[in-house]
């Protein structure tokens, strides 16, 4: 159903990603930006409150009719759980406790993972560092869709289904593109998460468990906040690899919309990225950006020139990939 997209392959490029060069230029001109490279202690308390909020929600939905369980999973839980994945993104950059307490960040990420229902935090950190270091690298950056995704999800209707199923593709794509040996922290993350899920089931019942899992599935699928998955790096304009979003949903997502700023300065917490843009305005104001993630989702589905193939991809230079 729907028109078939015109693109039949990724956009292969033979230049380095732009972020390292821009970072060097900005720091040379505005060295005061280095003062923003420090942890955000407020993140700790925000995450704790979000976790406790979902714990209360688990209790409140345990005796509701199923239709209301699913309603609140989408209307409320999805926003909290998607926001929590972006809190975990912040924690993966050591923004909670700083780089000198890296393990504190790993344990805190496992704690933040609890209301999501699926072990995620430790694996995300491992793959996300590759995404920054090797942006668009073939066989390394698992943020890039597989060839199957680009080939199959090539009509309006299929792209719509792809948007709904995004959490599943993000979960299983690493196994096909860049499988890594399981680490002991991933095992710990999994054991703690499964134990927590079992406790929720036995103490509160199946409805609370379904609410938790459905909130994650809904929030990471067809949801306004999920527009950031596509907005960040899908090539709506030829030659532009990363795009920022400056709309109101940044308030719920730890400023993940400031994505050019984030890739330029991954050591700066999300709360300070607007300051980066303000200080170095001439580097960002003229870059293409978005003001609506909902429009991004709509345009992705309906535009016949855009598909999962609409990503800039590059061959890895050299053979060494750092863990």
Curated annotation (Swiss-Prot):
Q: Which residues carry this modification: Phosphoserine?
A: 307
Q: Where is this motif: Histidine box-1?
A: 89-93
- Please explain the role this protein plays, according to its UniProt record: Has sphingolipid-delta-4-desaturase activity. Converts D-erythro-sphinganine to D-erythro-sphingosine (E-sphing-4-enine). Catalyzes the equilibrium isomerization of retinols.
Lineage, top-rank taxon, reads Eukaryota
BP terms from Gene Ontology: ceramide biosynthetic process; fatty acid biosynthetic process; myelin maintenance
Write out the residue ranges of the motif Histidine box-2.
128-132
Which Cys pairs does UniProt list as disulfide-bonded?
none
List the EC numbers from the record.
1.14.19.17, 5.2.1.-
What stretches pass through the bilayer?
41-61, 68-88, 102-122, 152-172, 184-204, 209-229
Q: Output this protein's name.
A: Sphingolipid delta(4)-desaturase DES1
The question of whether Protein biosynthesis is a record keyword is answered with: no
Q: Which organism is it from?
A: Bos taurus (Bovine)
Report what the Swiss-Prot or TrEMBL entry states about this protein's PTMs: Myristoylation can target the enzyme to the mitochondria leading to an increase in ceramide levels.
> Which positions anchor the lipid (N-myristoyl glycine)?
2
Write out the entry's keywords from A to Z: Endoplasmic reticulum, Fatty acid biosynthesis, Fatty acid metabolism, Isomerase, Lipid biosynthesis, Lipid metabolism, Lipoprotein, Membrane, Mitochondrion, Myristate, Oxidoreductase, Phosphoprotein, Transmembrane, Transmembrane helix
One GO cellular component term: mitochondrial membrane
Sequence motif Histidine box-3, location on chain: 259-263
Quaternary structure and interacting proteins, as annotated: Interacts with RLBP1; the interaction increases synthesis of chromophore-precursors by DEGS1.
**Topology in membrane:** Multi-pass membrane protein
Q: Where is it mostly found?
A: mitochondrion
Originating gene: DEGS1
Q: List the catalytic activities from the record.
A: an N-acylsphinganine + 2 Fe(II)-[cytochrome b5] + O2 + 2 H(+) = an N-acylsphing-4-enine + 2 Fe(III)-[cytochrome b5] + 2 H2O; all-trans-retinol = 11-cis-retinol; all-trans-retinol = 9-cis-retinol; all-trans-retinol = 13-cis-retinol
Q: Give the Gene Ontology MF terms in alphabetical order.
A: cis-trans isomerase activity; retinol isomerase activity; sphingolipid delta-4 desaturase activity
Protein family membership: Belongs to the fatty acid desaturase type 1 family. DEGS subfamily.
List where in the cell it is found: Mitochondrion membrane; Endoplasmic reticulum membrane
């Amino acid at each position: 159903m729907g028109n078939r997209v015109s693109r039949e392959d990724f956009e292969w490029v033979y230049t380095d990603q732009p972020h390292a060069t821009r970072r060097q230029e900005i720091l040379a001109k505005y060295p005061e930006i280095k003062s923003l490279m420090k942890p955000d202690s407020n993140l700790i308390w925000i995450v704790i409150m979000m976790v406790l909020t979902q714990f209360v929600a688990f209790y409140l939905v345990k005796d509701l009719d199923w239709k209301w369980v699913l309603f609140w999973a989408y209307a409320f839980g999805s926003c909290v759980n998607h926001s929590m994945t972006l809190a975990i993104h912040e924690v993966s950059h050591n923004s909670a406790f700083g780089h000198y307490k890296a393990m504190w960040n790993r344990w805190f990420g496992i704690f933040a993972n609890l209301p999501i229902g699926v072990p995620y935090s430790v694996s995300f950190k491992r793959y996300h560092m590759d995404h920054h270091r090797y942006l668009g690298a073939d066989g390394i950056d698992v943020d890039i869709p597989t060839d199957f995704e680009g080939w199959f999800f090539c009509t309006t209707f299929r792209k719509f289904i792809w948007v709904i199923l995004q959490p599943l593709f993000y979960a299983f794509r690493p196994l096909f593109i860049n499988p890594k040996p399981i680490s002991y922290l991933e095992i710990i993350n999994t054991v703690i998460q499964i134990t927590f899920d079992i406790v929720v089931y036995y103490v509160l019942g199946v409805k609370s468990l379904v609410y938790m899992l459905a909130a994650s599935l809904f929030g990471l699928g067809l949801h306004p906040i999920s527009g950031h998955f596509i907005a960040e790096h899908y090539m709506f304009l030829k030659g532009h690899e990363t795009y920022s979003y400056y709309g109101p949903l940044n308030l719920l997502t730890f400023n993940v919309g400031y994505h050019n700023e984030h890739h330029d300065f991954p050591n700066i917490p999300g709360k300070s990225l607007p300051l980066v843009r303000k200080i170095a305005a001439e580097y960002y104001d003229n870059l293409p950006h978005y003001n609506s993630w909902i429009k991004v989702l709509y345009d992705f589905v309906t535009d016949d020139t855009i598909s999962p193939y609409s990503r800039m991809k590059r061959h890895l230079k050299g053979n060494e990939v750092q863990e």
